[in-house]
Amino acid sequence: MQVEEYLNDIAEREGTVHLTLIDPASQSPEAAAEIAKAAVAGGTDAILIGGSTGAVGVALDQTLIKIKEQVDVPTILFPGNAGGVSTHADAIFFMSLLNSRDINYIITNQVMGAPVVYKSGIEPISMAYIISEPGGTVGWVGDAKLIPRNKPEIAAAYSLAGKYMGMHYTYLEAGSGADRPITPETIGAVKHVLGDNKLIVGGGIRDGKTAKICADAGADMIVTGTIVEETDDVRKKIEEIVSAIKK
């Protein structure tokens, strides 16, 4: 089964997919593998690997190798640039940062990375990436024109543009470590125009209650990353979030 099909099937059967994001720059490959193992034990459906800075080269490859030794769920690249591609992953979110002011994040990095993805056989999953306030590091690095929190219609317009350009997934991002997540109003407005296309929401989600609010508003997939770096019990925290968003 292809990774995209796997994720879509979980979304249909269980209501919401949970993805754990691990940044190779934040810990050793061995520590990353232990986090992934605990997250899978807690019920996460797949592991995202990537970050805004430093998630490239040997650190990325070794992190993927160690993670795949410990878990059986899909590993999906979440690249910050063309250097964030590794042949050791199962799939890649092949994305365009639609609200960037920098053409490198809209298409140039994608052009540079596409031949590598093609030759490696990694499964590409097309995705519109949209960053909302507060934006965090990724908003700064990606030079994003942040979507205002109180303007869901703007997020919906960007999402619709991505859908019409053929992108299967839309990712609404508040930024890693954000102090608050995407608003339910924005999630609902975006899901309304996306229809059957899948909506991913990440940033500022630290507990089951917040995750459930996002899922109930229309998120098909929930991403948590910073929390697995901060908590003393990864499995317990992931269990809390997963139990809140599944049917």
Swiss-Prot record:
Pfam families: PcrB (PF01884)
Subcellular location(s) per record: Cytoplasm
Pathway where it operates: Membrane lipid metabolism; glycerophospholipid metabolism
GO molecular function: magnesium ion binding; phosphoglycerol geranylgeranyltransferase activity
Residues that hold sn-glycerol 1-phosphate according to the record: 171-177, 203-204, 225-226
Keyword Cell membrane: no
Catalytic activity from the UniProt record: sn-glycerol 1-phosphate + (2E,6E,10E)-geranylgeranyl diphosphate = sn-3-O-(geranylgeranyl)glycerol 1-phosphate + diphosphate
Chief location category: cytoplasm
Binding positions for Mg(2+) per the UniProt entry: 23, 52
Keywords of this entry: Cytoplasm, Lipid biosynthesis, Lipid metabolism, Magnesium, Metal-binding, Phospholipid biosynthesis, Phospholipid metabolism, Transferase
Listed cofactors: Mg(2+)
Source superkingdom: Archaea
InterPro entries to which the protein is assigned, alphabetical: GGGP/HepGP_synthase_I, GGGP/HepGP_synthase_sf, GGGP_HepGP_synthase, GGGP_synth
EC number: 2.5.1.41
Similarity field: Belongs to the GGGP/HepGP synthase family. Group II subfamily.
Assigned GO CC terms: cytoplasm
Protein name (Swiss-Prot/TrEMBL): Geranylgeranylglyceryl phosphate synthase
Function: Prenyltransferase that catalyzes the transfer of the geranylgeranyl moiety of geranylgeranyl diphosphate (GGPP) to the C3 hydroxyl of sn-glycerol-1-phosphate (G1P). This reaction is the first ether-bond-formation step in the biosynthesis of archaeal membrane lipids.
One Gene Ontology biological process: glycerophospholipid biosynthetic process
The keyword Lipid biosynthesis belongs to this UniProt entry's keyword annotation: yes
Enzyme superclass (EC): transferase
